[in-house]
């Protein structure tokens, strides 16, 4: 579009400058122009759909599938971001991305993922006897939803023999080979144009607990 073309030209012209004083003025202006271009494009993309349709805005997220490790994610560092997934183990955390100048409306943030409430034996027992607590969650600004249990009844795995995911490699297989652990979604209504903070957190410590996840998606619900 013309807006993007103009912003890119402005950025290229800024990069051609050589003096520090010129660069210090031109680069911030070029960055603001690029952000404005993304804002205009996003607003146009979210308009003109049938009410209730989902518009995929995942392209606004940096590295939503962890194919580039932890790139793009702020806050608490992942325990690991390898084998195409990311994880937190035995810690509290708050990890997120902030999307600026988003159009007003309803958003949905989804992921494949699960939470294990401690060591696998005690977590399984807690799931079976109803004492399990799902401490890890997805959030969109002030809305939050917990991750599903590793031992959720929809998962086609067994405890004996143990075939549930037990490391990042087997979690990657569960997500990307088997297509499991998809029931993780949070919804938030942004009442006016503004920022969206999308992330995941856990504020309560639990010994040897585990949260593993992949394939984040951001969707706008057309109105």
Task: Describe each region flagged by the PLM.
Residues 206-223:
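Exposed low-complexity, polar/acidic, P/S/T/G-rich flexible segments that act as propeptides
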Residues 1-60:
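Beta-rich interaction/scaffold domains
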Residues 115-173:
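Extracellular ligand-binding interfaces
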Residues 71-75, 88-90, 103-104, 114-132, ...:
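Extended, low-complexity, turn-rich repeat/linker tracts enriched in Gly/Pro/Ser/Thr and Asp/Glu
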Residues 172-177, 199-209:
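Short beta-strand-plus-loop segments that form exposed binding edges in beta-rich domains
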Residues 66, 93-124, 184-190, 216:
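Extra-cytoplasmic beta-strand recognition segments
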Residues 62-93:
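Extracellular glycan-recognition surfaces and repeat-rich motifs
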Residues 187-202:
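Noncatalytic modules at the cell exterior or secretory-pathway interfaces
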């Amino acid at each position: 579009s013309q807006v993007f073309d103009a912003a890119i030209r402005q950025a290229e012209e800024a990069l051609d400058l050589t003096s520090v004083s010129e660069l210090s003025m031109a680069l911030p202006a070029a960055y603001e122009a690029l952000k404005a271009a993304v804002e205009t494009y996003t607003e146009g993309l979210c308009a003109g759909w049938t009410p209730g349709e989902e518009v995929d805005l995942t392209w606004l997220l940096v590295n939503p599938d962890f194919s580039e490790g932890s790139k793009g994610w702020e806050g608490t560092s992942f325990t690991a971001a390898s084998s195409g997934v990311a994880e937190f183990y035995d810690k509290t955390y708050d990890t997120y991305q902030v999307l600026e100048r988003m159009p007003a409306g309803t958003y949905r943030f989804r992921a494949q993922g699960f939470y294990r409430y401690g060591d696998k034996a005690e977590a399984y027992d807690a799931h079976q006897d109803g004492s399990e607590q799902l401490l890890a969650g997805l959030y969109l600004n002030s809305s939050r939803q917990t991750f599903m249990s590793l031992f959720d009844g929809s998962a086609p795995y067994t405890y004996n023999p143990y075939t549930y995911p037990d490391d990042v490699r087997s979690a990657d297989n569960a997500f990307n080979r088997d297509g499991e652990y998809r029931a993780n979604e949070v919804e938030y209504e942004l009442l006016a144009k503004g920022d969206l903070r999308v992330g995941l957190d856990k504020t309560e410590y639990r010994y040897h607990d585990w949260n593993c996840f992949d394939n984040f998606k951001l969707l706008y619900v057309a109105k």
